[in-house]
């Protein structure tokens, strides 16, 4: 189900990361990052593949050492999706990552080094057709900006961003994506809104950094990124969670799906239950969700606890069930198509899902 009036999108310059387009009106790109030892190429590749299966269009991998660089070469060669090298402190590792096959670099203005080192990275990336994300972070700003007491945190993030974008573009390098991350949602909103106004042509990578554990991080990311995306701001996104990285892409896709920006797999519509509910709805909804998780068809599936929330309120669902005492009424777009016993609800609903997909 998409919005009848699509959300406005700021038209930024297109940047290509391997075969994936960021900006220029392309769909919002979903990213995540591995947490394995990059020197262990096979373990990292296993996680990259799991992230791709979970919905990542691009995956970022940290390259902190020379040993990691060797593993990174294998990862780039065998990955099913474009790989981004995350670089801090050592510009030579950035150059090595380009040579190893990185589709994009992420560098941090606060620790990459002086302009000569930055220029060496720009030149290497330019020669290889490798994109670069200028990844500004509130916790590691350049010292001269961090010490400015007359600036707010969002203003500091914007100042660092503008400085680096200008330097890159003055050098003729325009294959850039920009991020300005903080753990505060309010700071994130102010910074990205300002960047969208001040540097409207550069694609923006959205994220709330250090967002927290699964529940807290999901809430903060959904609020911060959802607001920005609803305003047409953002070309790619990463939901950061203190959790298995595979937990991140479904949250990102959920945000995009909630706004009607992208669809991936079924959307589950289920009620919170009340005194009218006469079945144990929670495990039914959970089982339906679990059994649908590997389906790719963009269907709307409703699991409702009573007739009030059934075919009427969920009439736009492709398929659904309205549960009553010991039974469930199956419906499609508001029309009853069958009645089943309570213990057969999930199997019957899944059979109808499979039938609908086969018919399509």
Which residues does each PLM region occupy?
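Active-site mouth loops of central-metabolism enzymes
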Residues: 25-43, 62-64, 81-89, 144-158, ...
């Amino acid at each position: 189900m998409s919005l009848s009036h699509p959300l406005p999108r700021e038209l930024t310059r297109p940047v290509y990361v391997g075969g994936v387009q960021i900006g220029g009106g392309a769909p919002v790109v979903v990213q995540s990052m591995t947490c394995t030892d990059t020197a262990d190429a096979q373990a990292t590749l296993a996680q990259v593949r799991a992230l791709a299966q979970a919905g990542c269009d691009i995956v970022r991998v940290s390259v902190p050492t020379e040993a990691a660089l060797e593993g990174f070469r294998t990862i780039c060669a065998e990955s099913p999706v474009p790989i981004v090298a995350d670089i801090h402190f050592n510009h030579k590792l950035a150059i090595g990552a380009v040579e190893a096959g990185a589709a994009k670099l992420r560098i941090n203005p606060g620790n990459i080094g002086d302009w000569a080192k930055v220029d060496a990275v720009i030149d290497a990336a330019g020669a290889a057709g490798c994109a670069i994300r200028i990844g500004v972070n509130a916790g590691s700003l350049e010292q001269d900006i961090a010490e400015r007491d007359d600036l707010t945190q969002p203003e500091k993030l914007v100042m660092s961003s503008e400085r680096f974008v200008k330097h890159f573009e003055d050098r003729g390098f325009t294959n850039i994506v920009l991020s300005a991350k903080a753990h505060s949602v309010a700071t994130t909103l102010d910074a990205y809104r300002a960047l969208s106004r001040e540097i409207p042509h550069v694609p923006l990578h959205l994220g709330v950094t250090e967002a927290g554990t699964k529940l807290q991080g999901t809430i903060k990311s959904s609020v911060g990124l959802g607001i920005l995306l609803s305003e047409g701001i953002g070309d790619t996104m990463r939901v950061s969670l203190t959790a298995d990285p595979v937990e991140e892409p479904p949250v990102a896709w959920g945000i995009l799906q909630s706004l009607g920006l992208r669809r991936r797999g079924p959307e589950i519509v289920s009620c919170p239950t009340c005194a009218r509910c006469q079945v144990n709805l929670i495990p039914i909804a959970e089982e339906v969700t679990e059994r649908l998780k590997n389906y790719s068809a963009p269907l709307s599936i409703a699991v409702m606890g009573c007739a009030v929330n059934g075919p009427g309120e969920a009439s736009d669902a492709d398929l659904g069930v309205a549960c009553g005492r010991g039974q469930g009424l199956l419906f499609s777009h508001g029309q009853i198509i069958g009645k089943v016993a309570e213990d057969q609800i999930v199997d019957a609903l899944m059979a109808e899902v499979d039938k609908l997909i086969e018919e399509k």
